[in-house]
Amino acid sequence: MNRRMAIQQITASAVLLGATTARASRADGSRIGGAGSDGRGAQAAATATPTGPYTLPPLPYAYDALEPYFDAETMHLHHDKHHQSYVDKLNAAVEGHPDLSSRTVYDLVANLDAMPMAQLAAIRNQGGGHANHSFLWETLGKGGAAPSGELAKAIDAKFGSFSSFQEKLTAAAVGVFGSGWAWLVRLPGGVLAIETTPNQDSPLTVGHTPVLGVDVWEHAYYLKYKNKRPDYVKAYFSAVNWDAVSAKFADGKKA
């Protein structure tokens, strides 16, 4: 499979709910407002910036801090084992390539179409896993409740109400076939949308800024919830740090 086919698969796999969009392009094929050489900041601004050689970011809370929604054992395995594995394999893939390892992981996945073919699969899968999980940990915390301020207004404007948004994101997350993620994203034009990505694909690859992400890989919930993904997704909303999510939304608006 060549690079063009690989990127086309990622673009085709992003399922948007409540919006019909296309990735805007200039006549020369470069992206407008996306993550290209002159636009990558719009996505990276909404995330932290772990740089290479890549390291596992510490959890910003204790393993048991999200009980009873996420159990301590799952959090330990999810962070220390699964996420660490993505970091290790990404480092192995970019070893000896300072042109790659000097870039943030978000920059790598945002510019996947510019990656060397030899490293493309590893950056897509392992880099995506590192980027997605680094983002996830920052948006969880004791909280629940509901968003406020500008994010609440944007959600109401797009989805009608917070409860309607919850229903749509839940349906998207529960409906992912196999492993993947459900996302609330900010599109290049500023509109919110819900989309899903398979495996560890990132919204950044298609120029979308992640605001909130639900990991529906079984390793995220199977120890506690077994095959009851709907119960896990319901519990997820009680573990969202809406202040952190609102900050990412605000950062995305500035970029």
Residue ranges of predicted features:
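A generic secondary-structure signal for well-formed alpha-helical elements
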Residues: 14, 18, 86, 90-98, ...
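An amphipathic alpha-helical core segment
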Residues: 171-226, 234-243
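Short helix-capping/linker segments at secondary-structure and domain boundaries
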Residues: 23, 138-147, 224-229
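Mature N-terminal segment immediately following signal peptide/propeptide cleavage
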Residues: 53-85
